[in-house]
Design a protein with these regions (language model features):
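Mg2+-dependent prenyl diphosphate-binding active-site environment of isoprenoid biosynthetic enzymes
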Residues: 1-2, 6-169
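A mobile "lid/hinge" subdomain adjacent to the ATP/sugar-phosphate binding pocket shared
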Residues: 170-174
Length: 174
């Protein structure tokens, strides 16, 4: 649940975030509570397939967050690593939600695979668009510049770093 509030943003899609209302510690506890409540419901209802999807999603998001932290320290991220990170973080979460929806209505395995793949593509597109918002207008409901301040390596930043000279890179990194 901490990954959902990791950027400490006060707004989400134009609304106040849980973090803004309750601060980090309470936001993390509320997230942990909701996650454990959902997992217990899966156990009570013998929805082990759904429990497996949730567990795998949390694992993927954690791996993605750790990779992002590691790479941000060194600023040695390329497009391939960027896509690995967003697939493990945002895309795996959206993909998992789509998969759970399909599993919960007893879809065929081919339908589950298709909707899971669609969710992965939606998650990738969502994250790229979210990264672009960091550089956009104020009217979008997300504060600008947070990713840069937190040294998040985003696709626009990767493209910029690949297309500027060394002195410009040094200036940008400072």
């Amino acid at each position: 649940s901490e990954m959902c509030i990791r950027d400490r943003s006060n707004k989400r899609r134009g609304f106040f975030s849980i973090n803004a209302i309750w601060k980090n510690k309470i936001a993390v506890l509320v997230g942990d509570f909701l996650l454990s409540k959902g997992m217990l419901l899966c156990i009570d209802n013998k929805d082990y397939d759904i429990l497996d999807v949730i567990s795998e999603s949390v694992k993927q998001m954690s791996e993605g967050e750790l990779l992002q932290i590691e790479k941000a320290k060194k600023l040695d991220i390329d497009e391939e690593t960027y896509f690995e990170i967003i697939k493990k973080k945002t895309a795996s979460l959206i993909s998992s939600c789509c998969k759970i929806a399909a599993v919960s209505v007893n879809s065929s395995s081919s339908e589950v695979k298709r909707i899971t793949k669609i969710g992965m593509h939606i998650g990738i597109a969502f994250q790229i668009k979210d990264d672009l918002f960091d550089y956009g207008k104020k009217t979008i409901g997300k504060p600008r510049g947070i990713d840069i301040k937190q040294k998040k390596i985003t696709l626009p930043l990767i493209y910029t770093l690949n297309n500027i000279n060394k002195s410009e890179k040094r200036w940008l990194i400072k």
